[in-house]
Amino acid sequence: MRTGVIAKKLGMARFFDEAGVHVPVTVLSLEGCQVVAHRTKDKDGYVALQLGAGSKKPKNTSKGLRGHFAKGQVEPKAKLVEFKVSEDNLIDVGAELTADHFVPGQKVDITGTTVGKGFAGAMKRWNFGGLRATHGVSVSHRSHGSTGQRQDPGRTFPGKKMAGHYGQETVTTLNLTVWRVDAERGLILVKGAVPGTEGTFVKIRDAVKAALPADAPKPGAFRGAGAPTPVEAAADEAAPAEEPAVTEAPAAEATEAGDQA
């Protein structure tokens, strides 16, 4: 079982495949997704990787978390998430996961927090049909109707579908398809919609109901701590090489060389 990644939802876009079919995709960005700590069987009772993503100012980070990040030699992160893995899929602390951790065509499960819509009635929140338009019904056309039974049990059961806060829940969308991967810019394009608003973090992991592709990297695609990103490496290669400085001989030495000739 491999680790997942933490990505930031940038928004949606549209592309066209080779057949000219319109493909709506969600653009997800990996922003400094690093391994912060290990969870081991001996110490914690389970095996997992703690990942961090995004950046956070040290002054806005608690003292305990500052020490936690310093122990792993990573910068303070805005988001911390644990992914359970098998022992052979552990990755060194400080390593940064890259977008080619997933391969095009792979199925993934994505977890995020849905858009909050405030207080909503039962018809909007639970798709209730409402009461009749006539035949004695007045004012209560959009109400949910009865909430209980009679004297026995004499109460409303917990979990009854009623009006209340709508949205802002943790939701996992299963079996989304990875359409394209841009490892150089750290982007993952996924077919369809992903829960959450733009700018929020989501968790991406291998689909639990689909087989892992044979070409998926194990234990994952990552670069070591301190290694340059593809953009930085390309910039270094494109930079012009420094020409060696040409030093002129002093005038006295040039005159002596002319006299000897």
UniProtKB/Swiss-Prot annotation:
Superkingdom of origin organism: Bacteria
GO MF annotation: an example: rRNA binding
Region annotation Disordered: where it falls in the sequence: 138-163, 214-261
Record-listed N5-methylglutamine modification sites: Q151
One term under GO cellular component: cytosolic large ribosomal subunit
PROSITE patterns the UniProt entry points to: RIBOSOMAL_L3
Homology family: Belongs to the universal ribosomal protein uL3 family.
Complex formation: Part of the 50S ribosomal subunit. Forms a cluster with proteins L14 and L19.
Role: One of the primary rRNA binding proteins, it binds directly near the 3'-end of the 23S rRNA, where it nucleates assembly of the 50S subunit.
Name used for this protein in its record: Large ribosomal subunit protein uL3
Organism: Phenylobacterium zucineum (strain HLK1)
